[in-house]
Amino acid sequence: MTDPPAVGASDRIREFWDADASTYDATKSHSISDPLERAAWRQALSEALPHPPASVLDVGAGTGSLSLLAAELGYAVRGLDLSPGMLAEAERKANAMGLADRVTCAVGSASEPPPGPFDVVVERHVLWTIPDPVGALRSWLDVGRRLVLFEGTWGSRRLDHRTKEFAAEKLRKVMRTPPDHHAPYPEDVLAELPLARLPSPVPLVEAVHQAGWHGVRIRRLRDVEWAARLHEPWPFGWLEERPRYVIVADAES
């Protein structure tokens, strides 16, 4: 789930996500390990992807949460990520689940996908990490027939979201609850990422249009939100809940 914000910074970003790899799945929403949330994501994938068997490129695959779900549904998946550490976890899980024949991994930038064609290009919570999201989306258009983005309004500067984030952070410190990541994402890096802090999904839809994809449509993932809220202990599910969306588009009109 990684991409460098500028030329020369890739080592720094790769190191961040490599350091995150060993503990990343400790957060249930990262690993999609909660049975209810897993079922909600399985339904979301089934509705957005073409019928299996089909070839899937999972950009920013991370530890393979989405790749493995897709493989379970019968898809042949190629996982792409900048971090070797994250992909090592994905490969380990694929082997443990008996899915190694359906999931293969490649280390590389999200903006430089492997040669296609793929029936569908998917990503989950990745666009915010990319310094040129329109350019990346355009590169995916070169290798994919359909685009499926699973996104949310992360890091919103809205007052209500910031207030909830502040309350959750303070409460986690009091309760000594481990954070979602090994360290905060560097602020100077965030400043270079156009989609890092979104008040709404409008910039996401605009980026897809600008990249040249056709027939763009969007739907709120209310079942995923509901499932994620339920598996978190109160009040974290409420404090940390954010709107999530699936955006689908096609290479040809």
Residue ranges and their predicted role:
Residues 213-225:
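Conserved S-adenosyl-L-methionine
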Residues 122:
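A conserved beta-strand element that flanks and buttresses the S-adenosyl-L-methionine
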Residues 134-146:
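A short glycine-rich, Lys/Arg-flanked "PGG" loop and its adjoining helix->strand segment in the class I
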Residues 112-116:
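Short conserved loop adjoining the S-adenosyl-L-methionine
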Residues 1-52, 148-178, 222-224, 239:
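Conserved class I S-adenosyl-L-methionine
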Residues 195-212:
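Short alpha-helix
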Residues 57, 63-111:
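Class I SAM-dependent methyltransferase SAM/SAH-binding core
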